[in-house]
Structures are given as structure tokens and as C-alpha cells.
Regions:
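Residue-level detector of functional hotspots within protein domains
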Residues: 9, 40, 76
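Short terminal alpha-helical segments
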Residues: 24-48, 94-105
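Sec-dependent bacterial lipoprotein signal peptides
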Residues: 1-23
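Post-signal-peptide N-terminal segment of Sec-exported extracytoplasmic proteins
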Residues: 31, 38-72
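Intrinsically disordered, glycine/charged-rich N-terminal periplasmic/extracytoplasmic linker segments
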Residues: 56-107
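Weak global preference for isoleucine
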Residues: 2, 19, 39, 81-82, ...
């Protein structure tokens, strides 16, 4: 006798596959070395709770987006993290930025 798969079990298996395959990961920053350095500098600014450095990083990331070196989707995700840090939510911003960085795939 062949066991029957319930719809809920099948849906759970599909959802697990989608989640573990990275379909819901952060936007990718691309291969540009300058973008990598700018995001690394942003992590330092957020980690040290430095508003002035945070502003410089924000400006640099905008320049990279305008130059086509940072995809708009990645810039938007980072801008949201920066806004959160500006509101004083440094630890939450750092955690989100860390997740963004860990979610990057080498191209």
C-alpha cells in the first residue's frame, strides 16, 4: 500500500525547500569591490554607533547606486538599515546588516 501525502505535508515540504534554497534571502550587492568595502564600512559605523560615519557611508552607497555599482534593491535594503540606525536602533540594525552580509552569494 502506498502512503498518501496530505496536502498540508506537501505544502510544508515545498515551503521548507523554498526557504532552504535561499529564495527569501537578502538582495545581492553584486561583485563590485567598492560596494563590498562600503558595506563593510557601514558595518563598522553601525557596530560603533557612529552617526557621522553612518552619514558618510550612506552617501557613499548612494554614489555607488547612481554609478551602477550597487543594485537598487541592495541599496534600498541598506537604506532601511541605515534609517533604523538613525532612529537609535543600533543593535537591531547591526543584526539586520549582518544577515544581509551573510546572505550574499559569490558570483
Amino acid at each position: 500500500m502506498i502512503p498518501r501525502v496530505r496536502p498540508a505535508q506537501a505544502a510544508a515540504a515545498v515551503l521548507l525547500t523554498v526557504i532552504t534554497s535561499g529564495c527569501f534571502g537578502p538582495p545581492q550587492m553584486g561583485p563590485d569591490r567598492e560596494a563590498f568595502k562600503a558595506i563593510d564600512a557601514l558595518y563598522t559605523a553601525v557596530s560603533l554607533h557612529e552617526p557621522a560615519h553612518l552619514e558618510r557611508c550612506s552617501g557613499r552607497l548612494s554614489e555607488l547606486r547612481e554609478a551602477g555599482k550597487l543594485p537598487a534593491s541592495a541599496h534600498d535594503a541598506l537604506a532601511a538599515i541605515i534609517a533604523e540606525a538613525k532612529e537609535g536602533q543600533w543593535e537591531q540594525s547591526q543584526a539586520r546588516l549582518r544577515a544581509f552580509m551573510l546572505g550574499q552569494r559569490r558570483s
